[in-house]
Amino acid sequence: MREKNYQYRPCLHGKKQRLKNRVLVTKVSATSDKQSMKRKNNIYEKIYSMENLILADAKARKGKADQYGIKVFDRDKEGNLLKLQQMLINKTYKTSPYSTFLIYEPKEREVFRLPYFPDRIAHHAIMNNLEKIFTDMFTTDTYSCIKHKGIHGAARSVKVALKDVEGTTYCLKLDIKKFYPNIDHAVLKSLLRRKFKDQDLLWLLDEIIDSTNGVPIGNYLSQFFANFYLTYFDHWIKEEKRVKHYFRYADDIVVFSDSKLYLHQLRSDIADYLIQHLKLTVKDNYQVFPVVARGVDFVGYVFFHTHTLLRKKIKQSFARMLANRRNDASINSYYGWAKHCNSKHLLKKLLHDKTV
């Protein structure tokens, strides 16, 4: 399926011209982003260079040196890297079988895991060369799994937006139904071919994409595939719909406006775009509400115009973590979360009373 997309031409003059500019006139809106105009080639040989594979191994093992798979790999590190290089050169690389497990925070999800060798090294070898290409395409309004952005980057941007009190009277909050499992392989491959023309690279990406249904949560590559899958949608929101206050973290979307009617119409437009172009559906539990009434629950915080609180479930998990004296890394993570909101009294209570 070839995704249709459009470019919004800026208004020049007069009512007639404004009406004309509302017509969908040119294919591929994301090509207005200069980073998306040029298709990339000659990448594959950089992926299998020994220098890149050594770097990929170093990145993939960071903080995980005690894992059994890494210890096995290290028994013949040089030989194993040469094997991986030959798999890539000869195009005999095939994704290994996945193991799966469940996580329950922040919600129950099935997580997929691949062996350290050859898969996790191969994924890092790919992203050493593709990460900047992908991130250069992303709009400034997406935050998940992007260096120097993430949860706290999203929180900072929402706080800045809410300083425009009149322009953020109402909030549209929605997310996509089973986003990762429902990513369509044919659509994802089509989008990748709009960006890359290196046929060997596309073979490798196709092999990984087709290794399971949807895009598996837990793969290093998956977070980039997911953001890339929605990046043309992000550009449509910003460049054609001209939405000022828009924020996306993975499949969680928040939009602010001074008009409830506008947000309801935008939700309908978003649902139409996602189903027509990306074969995705918006969950039925979307919300349009006044910010002052209950705040905006997003990326672990509840945002108001005047202050920011920690989400109730995060607060409860933090309290349990402290009460049970679980690992320090997790406690530090929750503490870092709490520091970025109005939590002085909460922290004082938790750190002294160990209860909420």
How would you describe each model-predicted region?
Residues 1-33, 38, 115, 124, ...:
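Right-hand nucleic-acid polymerase module
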Residues 80, 87-88, 141, 155-250, ...:
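Conserved polymerase palm-domain catalytic core
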Residues 27-43, 127-184:
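Active-site-proximal segment of RNA-dependent polymerases
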Residues 271-280:
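A common structural junction motif
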Residues 74-97:
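Amphipathic alpha-helical blocks
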Residues 63-71, 96-121, 137-149, 207-227:
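Short, conserved non-catalytic motifs in the polymerase core
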Residues 1-82:
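Non-catalytic, polymerase-adjacent accessory regions of viral genome-replication enzymes
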